[in-house]
């Protein structure tokens, strides 16, 4: 077709496509200029005077002859992630005729923490959110640049969202752990409101999105995997559907959606071009990937081609957990495939959030470390290399218990005595956390030399003085979050930010309808999750744990229920039968001896896999994940391979949360190898 799958998913395909003179043409499809020539049709050239920024490009021209199929439905959901699967589940319960497009071969990774306000779980725990304070605090985070009417939807409807999901998850054996912890209030320090809203389902298996997939399949629905959004179709001010491309065959499909299109495609965190243009602080301070690399901002771009507006300021969600080796700077590096990636091999090092002493490359303390997750990272963007060093001693376990941080940083506290053995020591062995019997030796291991080493040792001594005084006269950190550096061995590590997602996206109103720059509704177009903006500016309020996901799930449910109230037919069920799925788990029990090879689709192309079988047993599996994200698929693949060998096949082997696309590709390739051996 002239466009590789990898280039297409990067978003570069649009630049090779012609441009419609008057925007998107209804009832047409995207093809490359070279294909148009081969078919004897002329594709327009890109407009030389385009006013669109380079990251956005122009809307593709649409040629009817490129369409292989036309699908008709009432509701089109684009994206099978957290929001998309929630919308699909609610729609399936009501018998709505809908389809779900998903560019990958599996549903998106499940985020397990969601925020819901004054839910039944909260009431059972005796917790109540001060809604007026919550609303005021949320607005303060954005300097008033949010739409409080949109915020109110999450505040007012998230309890119902929880009550909808809870029976589904409980029936699968999952248990909700409602967090009702409070931070200690102190004088002379910013009082952050941390509302009791976090609902954590404390078993990752089965994952919620997989559970919802199975739920809709039981009702006769299915997900159109391996179909990537190309653009939306539009008549006047009304969105009529979308064009998608089958990323395996290259074929184009037009989907006509009579009642609406829901954009649930996530943010643009996996698109370095958009990040560098829209969120320039990210390359200044981020070192780690904790996002789905296939989230390229395509839903945002497609909506903007259809006339939508997006938030004016960035809102990257960055946690202070991007563990790197000494000497590594923040920002992108280019991997062996020529792609921009972040350098850390670790997705998130959770203890990075703990308020221990932090110094820059000059060995100098530069802030009060008792802050929300992104504050140290943002401050480090102004320091050398965009990174900083965290230091603590062997009292780390008791210190963490006293600090009593909230949100997902509490995972470190919950480890108790296992913290050193299970989390810190493995990174010592990996060479990322340094350990020494003296602070001077630690300084050497961390790369401090000359004046910087002198500063580091002086800063450690000063920090001990502040601990003894129980008064941080230098930066004002609360006394209960001071710690001493006196009990060897000592630990030190370098940190940058770990990017989770972007929260700046399409303008929406309180019904999740997408808006134009003139604040007019684009008919039939809706957005949820990180494709829906209007709530976050500059950062994410990390002390509102689970707000991002809770908002996503609530908005998705709201859209479907709104359309039903407006008259979208119910009780119809799916209009198209589900295709036969060839993904059954297999065992090597009756297989012939030999070494077999196959390829599975990963995030960044094919994953070569080989399986060696002897006497009906899998004795060795290799999976080349060098093209996958190191901190995601690169970490998950070794364990998955071990599980496959132990299970003698793929029966009962689960994907690893956070790396489902890579894992699914390996599992499918192993199945293909087993089939060859039967």
Label every PLM stretch briefly:
Residues 256-327, 542-545, 549-558:
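Glycine-rich loop(s) and the adjacent beta-strand/alpha-helix scaffold that form part
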